[in-house]
Amino acid sequence: MMTAESREATGLSPQAAQEKDGIVIVKVEEEDEEDHMWGQDASLQETPPPDPEVFRQRFRRFCYQNTFGPREALNRLKELCHQWLRPEVNTKEQILELLVLEQFLSILPKELQVWLQEYRPDSGEEAVTLLEDLELDLSGQQVPGQVHGPEMLARGVVPLDPVQESSSFDHHEAAQSHFKHSSRKPRLLSPRALPATHVPAPQHEGNPRDQAMASALLTADSQAMVKIEDMAVSLILEEWGCQNLARRNLNRDSRQMNLGTVFSQGSENRNGSESTSKAEVKGDSTSHGEIAGRFQKEFGEKREQQGRVIERQQKNPEEKTGKEKKAPGPPTAKEKKPTTGERGPREKGKGLGRSFSLSANFNNTPEEIPSGAKTHRCDECGKCFTRSSSLIRHKIIHTGEKPYECNECGKAFSLNSNLVLHQRIHTGEKPHECNECGKAFSHSSNLILHQRIHSGEKPYECNECGKAFSQSSDLTKHQRIHTGEKPYECSECGKAFNRNSYLILHRRIHTREKPYKCTKCGKAFTRSSTLTLHHRIHARERASEYSPASLDTFGAFLKSCV
């Protein structure tokens, strides 16, 4: 009943309710713009692979009960693992990186896992970089008596006063959901906190959202507490969740001030109210309203002090860095709202950042950006992506940039993984060996295709005629026979072909290129098949050199040897 009431009070959407129950919905994004496999036909790029996160979850959540036997279960697991790790595309190092990244994310605290899911790091190094930046942001605002970094989030409990309730932060719905549905239970009564039973219900009439927020924060349990940890983590998710990697460095200073203000106020309020909380427990006659009044007074003084510092910083921006390093008090924030209803600079416009109001009223929250929204748009073709890294990779298609160059032959590539695969041509490295015949390959994808010769596996079947193929590219080419599609058109004469290889051969008619040369007579040809036919002419000429008389003499010689 408490869950239903909490959802009703805060207007929690069904999607947020699913996130509360641990159900993670991952959208399949078509963001890989270039095929990682070396030597595949260009037609394979027409169907980019889905998000690996979908296949990873399928692999991890696979149950034995869904199969008819152990062999089928094992084969299904192999198939799911292959779809997730993609050994035909990824190298050994990349597969190892995926496994280490998954384990690394699993050992992180729940809040950091949720935070990192917004960025979907591709490697462990990228995840560590994000966490180190977060730790630097927090450690830069060190508070006496507390620790640095994420450990700062796990200290202390703050009391919930009526004044605090009426002057609560301007949380959006995602932050409300995090407060109510946190997987960890609130701590029990301590000398640093007041029980929920000591907090009277608000009597004032105001915005219905005010009352909904207040009722959501109060629980029936007399020992329930609102922890500074949940508040801090919500602020981190709010500040960081809607910003991409490119914007993070630009907003670091303002975030440090914003987060530092919250932590500093939480520490000072906790220390200031510690003695009064102990007095409540021991039966002191001090009323809860007096404590709330003192807290409100101290809180108002801090806000006035922050407003004066902001004005000085706006007049003298050069003094900002020095003041942040020297001032022992709570840091200031440009985006903090000094007065009721006034919005910070980042709230004007696109809604990519968030500022929090410390006023007595709840202000309207700017429009939220969904977590799966494709906010990064290509100016050339208009295609959108969820991550800036995917947009950068996509732009290589338009710019033709190939920053990775081979030191041996000078050939350039747009992706580093393709360069690694190419360099094996020069080194002769063939790390992938067949267990059946011992044949080795430089690419894992070639080994997988080779193993189908031994197994006779043809997993790709045509829906029209039922013909099966061992490679998906062969099926794609075959299906064009039924559809009549000819996507490859010659720019010279306009003739179209259903295969890229046919177009390459056709272009040699216009360029007069003849790369296949006979070693006997020096004659050149445009196709290798034509050169093979030409070799038969020389073979017949050699056979005609042996006359019947010479053959009889050679036969007599063999008989004499016997």
From Swiss-Prot:
Annotated Basic residues bias: 178-187
Annotated positions of the Phosphoserine modification: S13
Cross-link Glycyl lysine isopeptide (Lys-Gly) (interchain with G-Cter in SUMO2), where in sequence: K27, K180, K227, K278, K297, K302, K337, K374, K411, K439, K477, K559
Record field: transmembrane: none
Keyword tags: DNA-binding, Isopeptide bond, Metal-binding, Nucleus, Phosphoprotein, Repeat, Transcription, Transcription regulation, Ubl conjugation, Zinc, Zinc-finger
Domain KRAB per the UniProt entry, residue ranges: 226-305
Keyword Transcription regulation: yes
Compositionally biased spans, kind Polar residues: 261-276, 356-366
Any Pfam family the entry gives: KRAB
ZnF C2H2-type: positions: 376-398, 404-426, 432-454, 460-482, 488-510, 516-538
InterPro entries: KRAB (IPR001909), KRAB_dom_sf (IPR036051), SCAN_dom (IPR003309), SCAN_sf (IPR038269), Znf_C2H2_sf (IPR036236), Znf_C2H2_type (IPR013087)
Main location (coarse class): nucleus
Domain SCAN box: 56-138
GO molecular function term, any single one: zinc ion binding
One of the GO biological process terms: regulation of transcription by RNA polymerase II
GO terms under cellular component: nucleus
Region of interest called Disordered, as start-end residue ranges on this chain: 1-23, 31-50, 164-187, 261-372
Function: May be involved in transcriptional regulation.
Similarity remark: Belongs to the krueppel C2H2-type zinc-finger protein family.
Protein name, UniProt field: Zinc finger protein with KRAB and SCAN domains 1
Protein species of origin: Rattus norvegicus
Organism taxonomic ancestry: Eukaryota, Metazoa, Chordata, Craniata, Vertebrata
Gene: Zkscan1
